[in-house]
UniProtKB/Swiss-Prot annotation:
Record HAMAP family: Ribosomal_bL33
Keyword Protein biosynthesis: no
Biological process per Gene Ontology, one example term: translation
InterPro entries recorded: Ribosomal_bL33, Ribosomal_bL33_CS, Ribosomal_bL33_sf, Ribosomal_zn-bd
Record's protein name: Large ribosomal subunit protein bL33
Entries under Gene3D superfamilies matching the protein: Ribosomal protein L33
Keyword list, A-Z: Ribonucleoprotein, Ribosomal protein
Family from the record: Belongs to the bacterial ribosomal protein bL33 family.
Record gene name: rpmG
One Gene Ontology cellular component annotation held by this UniProt entry: cytoplasm
Molecular function via GO: structural constituent of ribosome
């Protein structure tokens, strides 16, 4: 089953992206994405949507 999650910037805390992930995986998603508030590519971590 897939669940909706938000990706939050690790520097400013802004929720910039929403995606889905497999619920069976235990580790949190960590992706390097662009943050418009920071104006840079930063690590975004998974949070509840």
């Amino acid at each position: 089953m897939r669940v909706k999650v938000a990706l939050k910037c690790s520097q400013c805390g802004n929720k910039n992206y929403y995606t889905t992930r497999n619920k069976d995986k235990r580790a949190k998603l960590e992706l390097r994405k662009y943050c418009p508030k920071c104006n840079a590519h930063t690590i975004h971590t998974e949070t509840k949507a």
